[in-house]
């Protein structure tokens, strides 16, 4: 395996690998989500308190997808997941222990499994990998994200 592996179309199996490999923390970044996030967190061997989600809520989505997203977020919070909000987030990533990730265009939804998407599997420790800056940026976004979407700047 190389440090960056392209994944055309559906990244689900790679997301699952990353979720199952988590040893200390698993974080998902996604502006759009559904029960897929719950499923991936359930497949992770860690407790709910070691799981995190970063999403955006800076525009009101009154569609069924937006309603589903709110239901899933409320369930995650009840389960003990650390849910944070980052205005204008558009990145899609699942990150295990800040050293393995899948980053790409695919939202964490069941619908996106049938879309034309491209993602990349990243491994910080593969020979020749120079991905420290990438994982540092994701970690900075995690730290930057707030816990209350009501406080977000809506500019």
Language-model features: locations:
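Signature of lipid phosphatidyltransferase scaffolds
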Residues: 3-8, 102-155
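Primarily the HKD phosphodiesterase
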Residues: 12-78
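Short glycine-/acidic-enriched loop or helix-start segments at secondary-structure transitions
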Residues: 37-38, 95, 112-113
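General small-molecule cofactor/ligand-binding pocket signal
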Residues: 81-86
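Short Gly/Ser/Thr- and Asp/Glu-enriched loop/turn motifs at secondary-structure junctions
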Residues: 88-90
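Short beta-strand scaffold segments in enzyme catalytic cores
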Residues: 92-95, 120-121
């Amino acid at each position: 395996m190389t440090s960056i592996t392209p994944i055309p179309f559906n990244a689900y199996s790679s997301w699952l690998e990353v979720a199952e490999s988590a040893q200390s923390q698993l974080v998902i970044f996604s502006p759009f989500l559904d029960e897929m996030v719950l499923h991936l967190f359930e497949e992770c061997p860690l407790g709910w308190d070691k799981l995190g989600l970063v999403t955006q809520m800076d525009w009101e989505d009154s569609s069924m997808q937006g309603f589903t997203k709110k239901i899933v977020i409320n369930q995650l919070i009840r389960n003990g997941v650390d849910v944070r909000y980052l205005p204008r987030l558009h990145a899609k990533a699942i990150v295990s222990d800040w050293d393995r990730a899948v980053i790409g265009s695919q939202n964490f939804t069941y619908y996106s499994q049938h879309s034309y998407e491209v993602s990349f599997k990243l491994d910080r420790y593969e020979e020749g990998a120079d991905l420290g800056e990438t994982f540092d940026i994701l970690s900075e976004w995690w730290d930057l994200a707030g816990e209350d979407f009501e406080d977000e700047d809506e500019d």
